[in-house]
Amino acid sequence: SETAAELWGVDGVSLVKRLTGGTAFADVAVDDSIAAGSRELVVGASLNGKLFLAYDSSVDRLHVYDPQLGTPRVRRVSLATPAAPTVANTGAGAYAATIRYYRVRWIQLNSGVEVRRSEAGASVTFTPSGSGTHARITQPAVAGEGETHWAIEASEDNASFYVLTEPATATTTYDDNETVADYSEE
């Protein structure tokens, strides 16, 4: 609607500002600053209640103003791709020595609703020793882009992956004791 209209601008020192229903521009928090000398090349498009901004910055990613965030700001679109997790044997028992593959994705939830999800990171190949009870998957270093959870995916063929669980990022390990045949039933 016209009452929700906003005017956006970039000033001479690449500060992003917005005018909404008033007469004064307000500064907008920006995760990645606009590169010097390229402020006149900022391009924006509104979609689904957000303002997407394409501009030159130190990070080669599209940006978006998301008014639904707890602290509205211009953030990167999507999340950084995670590194591969590490996997090790744990416990004493008879966990089958069958080759399997693990990979992870970052997820950001806001009030239980998924806001964004990263691309899958590289997979890691793991064959249990046969004398443990679980394969312990350890989270890679968190990207620090607002991710709240991580999806742990497993595969028996390194092609078809299935989500095992999506714990909060504060939970840094997960113990998998499923057989590879059960992955597709998760």
What kind of feature is each model-predicted range?
Residues 1-12:
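Beta-strand-rich domains and repeat architectures in extracellular enzymes and scaffolds
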Residues 17, 22-186:
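Disordered, low-complexity "stalk" and linker segments at domain junctions of extracellular
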